[in-house]
Amino acid sequence: MVFSTFQFLITTLLAVVCARAISLSEGDIPVLAMVIPALWILPQGGIAGLALLAAMTTYGLTLPIQPITLSVSTWVLFPLLMVVFSRRSSLSVVIISGLIVTTLQVGIMVTQSAGKLDGTPWVTLLQVLSIMVIWWAANHLKPASQHSWWSLGLILPLWIADLPYAALVALCLTGIMASMEAMMKLKTFRWNKLLCWTLPTAGFAALVITPSIEVPSPVFVVWLCLLGTAWMTDYIIRTEDNEDIDI
């Protein structure tokens, strides 16, 4: 349990470092940095692995175009998707949550169209879809012992090209995937569920508390609403389950 807790803290730290590296690079992250972690896990992924590779590639291509804070904040969809598509969920929960997400993201895209927020509306939509596919792929990947360790060698060209932040992002993402895969095998506690809540929150929070980074109000409000929606949905579902048990 002590080792698992330590591993959880290290994984959270990797998410914070990854978010800060992306911000310090000002979006100058080559798509290769996002592809390397997907290639590392590809041999045991099957269709899910290919979907992960495609989604990570797409997300990587959008980084130079979008504001960094918006790109990082989009990962808050992970806990919401986990709750909405859990076994305890229902069709009404999926529909209501879908309407909330759609409304909030349309608000962001309208703000971008009005010139009040940097970035492009269609790229915002592309990022949202990429995160959804990444969540689906991560949810269908199974732990395995085979990995493409050769893919880590691709970090060397990033370093030689004087792109240390890109190399750091690739290492952090690979480390996060490896840690989550290892913790998935543990039966004592549902660490991956806790990580699903913690990693997106910690990564974005690291940007919020950094004095040199200005988080646009629309981005912060939407992030907070999505996180609140995920938490409230989870709370309501749990409450209903407890009432059913009591009956």
Regions inferred by a protein language model and the residue ranges of each:
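Transmembrane helix interruption/hinge and helix-loop junction motifs
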Residues: A21-G27, L42-I47, T62-L70, R88, ...
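Non-cytosolic membrane-interface motifs at loop->transmembrane helix junctions
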Residues: T57-T58, L117-W122, P218-V222
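N-terminal signal-anchor module of multipass membrane proteins
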Residues: M1-A33
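Aromatic-anchored segments of alpha-helical transmembrane domains
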Residues: A54-P64, L99-V110, L152-A161, L199-I209
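C-terminal transmembrane-bundle signature of multipass membrane proteins
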Residues: A161-I247
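Membrane-proximal helix-loop-helix units in multi-pass membrane proteins
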Residues: L70-F78, S86-P157, A166
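Membrane-helix interface "capping/anchor" motifs
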Residues: L39-A51, P64-L70, V83-I95, W136-H147, ...
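Alpha-helical transmembrane segments and their membrane-interface exit regions
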Residues: M34-P43, T58-T62, V76-S86, T102-Q105, ...
